[in-house]
């Protein structure tokens, strides 16, 4: 709320939002049309599962609106005085998007992009990316409703210290960590969060909520990648990816400003390396330091994973 309070903020947001949505939507629709004929969406169960995600998002949004003191409708509405400017900017951006799409097709940029490794990853993991994005939005709504600057106590639920971590991660002038079990958060979590805060202006407290929600969506994507590799069945992997994202623990700790979701993300990344049979110390050691730096005790789970994978130390 109150993040966009200048004319240029409204113009930039409207144009960026519309351009991103139109360009991304165009290529997603093309991909979906192909998938319906011969791909992931060719299975009716997959279509049903894909459609449940927007329904879940709408349901969580409506539930949050039932608590106006926690999630006022003003959080997501464009101020009335800026509505005309927002609409005009969106129309201009939409027209610009058409021109950009024509140039992309004319110069064959899309065909060149199809040959890149990034496109290959997106193509193979689009269901997981889609699920991760929807859960990012769900957790963002919950994070905005749950977290508050009015918190002045620790251990609000399951030892989650939302108030101090909101400040540790996002307060512009810095904040004392006072937690020896999280040795590297000031050079991992905080820089990432403060980068997001650069775009939030005076509303720095929004950046921890966004970063937590982004990590939540990322863990959903990593769950999809892990399961797809393990079972070689897209439908099975997608079902359990949705179950993973919709669990109460993931929805809660993917929304509260704490270290839990960052710890989960680093652990899952390490497990993906193990699953890929990664043996290079140049990769494993930095990944292990990241796990250790978020929460010291998490390194034990990484070591257990390496042990059972028979890395080859003996």
Give the ranges of each region predicted by the language model.
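Start-transfer (signal-anchor) and selected internal transmembrane alpha helices
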Residues: 19-52, 80-142
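Transmembrane-helix motifs of polytopic, lipid-linked glycan transferases
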Residues: 210-230
């Amino acid at each position: 709320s109150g993040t966009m309070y200048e004319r240029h903020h409204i113009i930039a947001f409207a144009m960026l939002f519309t351009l991103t949505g139109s360009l991304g939507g165009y290529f997603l629709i093309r991909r979906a049309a192909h998938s319906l004929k011969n791909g992931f969406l060719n299975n009716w169960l997959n279509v049903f599962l894909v459609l449940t995600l927007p329904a879940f998002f709408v349901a969580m949004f409506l539930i949050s609106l039932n608590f106006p003191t926690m999630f006022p409708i003003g959080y997501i509405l464009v101020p009335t005085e800026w509505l005309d400017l927002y609409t005009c900017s969106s129309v201009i951006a939409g027209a610009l998007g058409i021109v950009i799409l024509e140039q992309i097709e004319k110069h064959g940029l899309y065909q060149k992009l199809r040959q890149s490794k990034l496109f290959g990853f997106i193509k193979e993991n689009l269901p997981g990316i889609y699920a991760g994005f929807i859960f990012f939005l769900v957790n963002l709504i919950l994070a905005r409703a749950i977290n508050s600057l009015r918190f002045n106590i620790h251990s609000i639920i399951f030892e989650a210290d939302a108030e101090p971590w909101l400040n540790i991660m996002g307060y512009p002038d810095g904040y004392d960590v006072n937690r020896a079990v999280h040795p590297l958060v000031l050079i991992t979590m905080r820089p990432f969060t403060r980068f997001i805060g650069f775009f939030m202006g005076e509303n720095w407290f929004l950046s921890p909520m966004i970063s937590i929600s982004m990590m939540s969506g990322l863990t959903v994507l990593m769950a999809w990648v892990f399961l797809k590799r393990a079972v070689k069945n897209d439908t099975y992997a997608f079902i359990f990816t949705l179950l993973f994202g919709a669990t109460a623990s993931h929805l809660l700790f993917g929304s509260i400003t704490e270290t839990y979701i960052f710890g989960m993300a680093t652990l899952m990344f390490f497990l993906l390396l193990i699953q890929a049979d990664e043996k290079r110390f140049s990769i494993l050691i930095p990944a292990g330091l990241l796990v250790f730096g978020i929460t010291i005790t998490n390194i034990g789970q990484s070591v257990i994973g390496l042990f059972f994978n028979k890395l080859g130390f003996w």
